[in-house]
UniProtKB/Swiss-Prot annotation:
Ranges annotated as biased composition (Polar residues): 196-211, 1022-1033
Record bears the keyword Phosphoprotein: yes
InterPro entries: CAP-Gly_dom_sf, CAP-Gly_domain
SUBUNIT field: Interacts with CLASP1 and CLASP2. Binds preferentially to tyrosinated microtubules, and only marginally to detyrosinated microtubules.
GO cellular component, one term: microtubule cytoskeleton
GO MF: microtubule binding; microtubule plus-end binding
Protein name: CAP-Gly domain-containing linker protein 2
Domain of life of the source: Eukaryota
Tissue: Expressed in the brain, and very low levels in kidneys.
């Protein structure tokens, strides 16, 4: 039955055979299109048509990610063996050399030898060696951070997107899907693009989560691996508020015992861990790092990706949507099918009268419709090809965008790491320089102490020499006294011999007295005439007393000399040990300073090597990125140019991409302008700071110059005063010389008197011997007197018997002869006694005269000693004044050293500001950078010339002071008595110390010149580095890093 329009129902249209011999696919697609022309989008027929295609696409896409997930699981959970090649965090290649537990942290660890020197050790940690490798190529990591293949950017999501697009193309060519309305083509295409970009971004974020540090992510969970303070790694065990402080805190169990607690603070436990492994830190100081061993964030992200892919594959027939868009683009310029049918129906109604003509016209129209349907199928196939090509191009563009973003992120991350390394090296360099300065100060202090100890040692040596000289003099005097004692002993022995001879003579006299009685009366008369024996002389007692005093004084001097010698020997030993200790410490500190210098040099070389490596890597990344962009342009230019419409659509797409790129470039340019403005402000601020520092430095230099001039004038006045004092000392020294001559004359007189005293003592000894002999002779005279009385009695008896006995006349004559002889001997003895008395009186008179002379000389000696004491006091005062002048000169040299150190410190701060200015100038545009560089060079030359002039002036002043000091020292040497070696040694030590101070000041001036030259070389090097950095386009990450540091 026919409709009122005269056409057959659409259900029978499928019975016509294809006149061109189309395949079944074309007929099926035509029947579907014919059936959908009269039905709506939400009809059951439409749902049946779209259902199989979507389910098939979903099945195709959902079956693909299975092997990929299994492969990734094997990479993370597979068993690693020693010698296997792996990648640490997916970016650092190396070979496994150790698997197992370690002593520095609990759990399982993997030791890897990296290909590049970007590690942390040489296989040994904490003094324990686990494997052997070169320095900075060994690293210890968790096995969960190792992969058997390098991690590529956006690998998983790109695979899903490619598979989904493949499924769409298959469904498009199969023709099983029904296209929806044309009004949904543009937003669905945008959704496809957004989904592809989103998956690319998710893949990039997944890579960054697995292989690098996420800076802005503060969503921390229990079990996440984090980095605390930029140096300490660990696992999150607690997140929330605490009792010991306000705000959000994060409790971390560290990998190494570098913490402060065991999870409990102030009696409250927040988590459990070993001691020294727990650490609490604010959340803003904690950064989450990749490969969390127990973190659920990875599972959530993979689940979210899987849901995104499944949603994309299960969406209502994305292939049919693309086919509908192509149909809409091809049918938009020609009449629709419904209009064509109405036209044929109107023609058929006008010619209804002729059935034959109508049937022919109907056949023609039917053929025309079939021809149009065939053309429509061909165009649809071509549009499907074009859309697939566009999808591929969009996919490639998305991949290139993701790769570009990944390259930019990696470059920024590497640059940030390089900056952190440079900053750490700078800090270490500053710390090492500070330590070097401290060690240098310590060494200078030790040198000063060693010099002082050497000076004191010289003084002690001079004192010991003086004491030795005194000991020698005392020994000589002792030898003289011993010689005198021996001489006195010999004289005593001689006197004893003389007394023995006298005794023999007395015995002979007794025999003669017994023989001759006649001499008894004469001897008695002589004895009566001789007076009583004289008393003992006081001169002998005085001489004995003086001798005892001399002996006691010699003993005391000997005892004091021995005590002083022992004391000074002990002090000399102690000072020698202290000097040895100081010398050993000085050598030790010198060795430590040399080691620190070597470490600083090694750190600087390693820093430069790392900077060169990072620059080469950045250059290679930039060249690879440029090559990829050129390849993309080549592929876009070399596409198929069969039809004008496809080229137009591609051009429109490219124009849209160009517009997006222009918008991004505009945003980047605005951002760059903002950063350049900020850098300009920073540069202005740095210039102002530099100008202020320069003004301050100029003021300080002027102040130091004035202070130096004042000190120089003060030193000149002090030197003038010292010269006046030296003149006074010269005059006093002349007086001392005159007094010394007088003292020497008095000493000679005293020696002469001592000799006379010794002679008088000898004579007194002789006198004593004579007195003893006289006493003995008196005793003998007494005995003779008794005998004489006996003889007188006998004579009286003889006289009474004279008359009776005449026979005895002859005997009496004999007795008279004997008495005559006895009288003669007694007279001889009396003469001898008179002579001895005269000699004794003469000797006593001489002793009195000598005593008077000795007392006068003693008075003169006392007055001379008083003068000598006063002159010695004056000499000590002059020496103290000279020592004060030398101390002032030493203090002036110390102030010069301090001023030179201050100059070095100010120059160091000025160089730091200049480095900051150079870094700021490096990011400025070309002409402005050149202009600032020229200005900086000119300022640098001016400052360098000023520093050289200052150094030259300081050297001239130092040489002038050295000359004045040498003149004053020469004058001082001319004024001082050459016979005083301690003063000469002391002044020589002072001269050596002042020369050392001047030499140190000159060395420091040379060091300042070397620093100026080194800073000039550093400025040239930084300029070349800034030129290379600006040529490679690295300044934008530097600015971003600076802004992050400011925030």
């Amino acid at each position: 039955m026919q409709k009122p329009s005269g056409l057959k129902p659409p259900g029978r249209g499928g019975k016509h055979s294809s006149p061109v011999g189309r395949p079944s696919v074309g007929s099926a697609s035509s029947s579907v299109v014919a059936s959908t022309s009269g039905s709506k989008e939400g009809s059951p027929l439409h749902k049946q048509a779209s259902g199989p295609s979507s389910s098939g696409a979903a099945t195709t896409v959902s079956e693909k990610p299975g092997p990929k997930a299994a492969e990734v699981g094997d990479d993370f959970l597979g068993d690693f063996v020693v010698g296997e090649r792996v990648w640490v965090n997916g970016v650092k290649p190396g070979v496994v050399q150790y698997l197992g537990e370690t002593q520095f942290a609990p759990g399982q660890w993997a030791g890897v030898v990296l290909d590049d020197p970007v590690g942390k050790n040489d296989g040994a940690v904490g003094g324990v060696r686990y494997f052997e490798c070169p320095a900075l190529q060994g690293i210890f990591t968790r096995p969960s951070k190792l992969t058997r293949q390098p991690t590529a950017e956006g690998s998983g999501s790109d695979t899903h997107s490619v598979e989904s697009l493949t499924a769409q193309n298959l469904s498009l060519h199969s023709g099983t899907a029904t296209p929806p309305l044309t009004g949904r083509v543009i937003p669905l295409r945008e959704s496809v693009l957004n989904s592809s970009v989103k998956t690319g971004n998710e893949s990039g974020s997944n890579l960054s989560d697995s292989g690098s540090v996420k800076r802005g992510d503060k969503d921390l969970h229990l079990g996440d691996r984090v980095l605390v303070g930029g140096t300490k790694t660990g696992v999150v065990r607690y997140v929330g508020e605490t009792d010991f402080a306000k705000g959000e805190w994060c409790g971390v169990e560290l990998d190494e015992p570098l913490g402060k607690n065991d999870g409990a603070v102030a009696g409250t436990r927040y988590f459990q861990c070993p001691p020294k492994f727990g650490l609490f830190a604010p959340i803003h100081k904690v950064i989450r790092i990749g490969f969390p061993s127990t973190s659920p964030a990875k599972a959530k992200k993979t689940k979210r990706m899987a849901m995104g892919v499944s949603a994309l594959t299960h969406s209502p027939s994305s292939s049919s949507i693309s086919s509908v868009s192509s149909v809409a683009s091809s049918v938009g310029g020609r009449p629709s099918r419904s209009g064509l049918l109405t036209e044929t129906s109107s023609r058929y109604a006008r010619k209804i009268s002729g059935t034959t003509a109508l049937q022919e016209a109907l056949k023609e129209k039917q053929q025309h419709i079939e021809q149009l349907l065939a053309e429509r199928d061909l165009e649809r196939a071509e549009v499907a090809k074009a859309t697939s090509h566009i999808c591929e191009v969009e996919k490639e563009i998305a991949l290139l965008k993701a790769q570009h973003e990944q390259y930019v992120a990696e470059a920024e991350e590497k640059l940030q790491r390089a900056r952190l390394l440079v900053e750490n090296v700078r800090k270490e360099k500053v710390d090492l320089s500070n330590q070097l300065e401290e060690e240098r100060r310590k060494v200078e202090d030790l040198q000063f102490r060693v010099e002082e100890e050497s000076i004191t040692k010289g003084d002690l040596e001079t004192q010991t020499q003086l004491e030795h000289a005194r000991i020698g003099e005392l020994e000589q005097s002792l030898l003289l006294e011993k010689a005198q004692a021996e001489r006195l002993l010999r004289e005593l022995a001689d006197n004893r011999l003389t007394t023995v001879a006298e005794k023999s003579r007395v015995l002979q006299l007794e025999e003669e007295l017994s023989l001759r009685r006649g001499e008894i009366e004469e001897l008695q008369h002589c004895l009566l005439q001789s007076g009583p024996p004289p008393a003992d002389h006081p001169e002998a007692a005085e001489t004995l007393r003086l001798r005892e005093r001399l002996l006691s004084a010699s003993k005391e001097h000997q005892r004091d000399s021995t005590l002083l010698q022992d004391k000074y020997e002990h002090m000399l030993k102690t000072y020698q040990t202290e000097v040895d200790k100081l010398r050993a410490a000085n050598e030790k500190y010198a060795q430590e300073v040399a080691d620190l210098k070597a470490k600083v040099q090694q750190a600087t070389t390693e820093n430069m090597g790392l900077m060169d490596n990072w620059k080469s890597k950045l250059d290679s990344l930039a060249s690879d990125h440029q090559k990829s962009l050129e390849d993309l342009k080549a592929t876009l230019n070399s596409g198929p140019g069969a039809q004008q419409k496809e080229i137009g659509e591609l051009k429109a797409l490219v124009e849209g991409i160009k517009m997006e790129h222009q918008l991004e470039l505009g945003n980047l340019q605005a951002k760059h302008d903002l950063e350049t403005a900020m850098h300009g402000k920073e540069k202005e601020g740095l210039r102002q700071k530099l100008q202020e520092v320069q003004e301050e430095l100029a003021g300080l230099q002027q102040h130091w110059r004035e202070q130096l001039e004042e000190q120089a004038s003060q030193h000149r006045l002090e030197l003038q005063e010292a010269q006046d004092q030296c003149r006074d000392a010269q005059l006093r020294a002349q007086e001392l010389e005159g007094l010394d001559v007088e003292y020497r004359g008095q000493a000679q007189a005293i020696e002469f008197l001592k000799e006379q005293i010794s002679l008088a003592e000898k004579k007194m000894l002789d006198y004593e011997m004579l007195q003893r002999a006289e006493a003995q002779s008196r005793q003998e005279a007494e005995r003779l007197r008794e005998k004489l009385l006996v003889a007188e009695n006998r004579l009286q008896a003889a006289e009474s018997l004279c008359s009776a006995q005449h026979s005895h006349v002859i005997e009496s004559s004999d007795l008279s002869e004997e008495t005559i002889r006895m009288k003669e001997t007694v007279e001889g003895l009396q003469d001898k006694l008179n002579k001895r008395d005269k000699e004794v009186t003469a000797l006593t008179s001489q002793m009195d005269m000598l005593r008077a002379q000795v007392s006068a000389l003693e008075n003169k000696c006392k007055s001379g000693e008083k003068k000598i004491d006063s002159l010695l006091k004056e000499k000590r005062r002059l020496e103290a004044e000279l020592e004060a002048v030398s101390r002032k000169t030493h203090d002036a040299s110390g102030q010069l050293v301090h001023i030179s150190q201050e100059l070095l410190r100010k120059e160091r701060s000025l160089n730091e500001l200049r480095v900051l200015l150079l870094e700021a100038n490096r990011h400025s545009p070309g002409p402005e950078r050149d202009l600032s560089r020229e200005v900086h060079k000119a300022e640098w030359r001016i400052k360098e010339q000023k520093l050289k002039d200052d150094i030259r002036g300081l050297r001239e002043k130092l040489t002038g002071l050295d000359k004045e000091k040498s003149l004053s020292e020469q004058r001082r040497y001319s004024l001082i008595d050459p016979a005083s070696p301690p003063e000469l040694l002391k002044l020589q030590h002072q001269l050596v110390s002042t020369e050392d101070a001047l030499r140190d000041a000159l060395n420091q001036a040379q060091q300042v010149e070397r620093l100026v030259e080194a800073l000039r070389g550093c400025s040239d090097r930084t300029q070349t580095i800034s030129n290379s950095g600006s040529a490679n386009g690295i300044h934008q990450p530097d600015k971003a890093h600076k802004q992050e540091d400011k925030h």
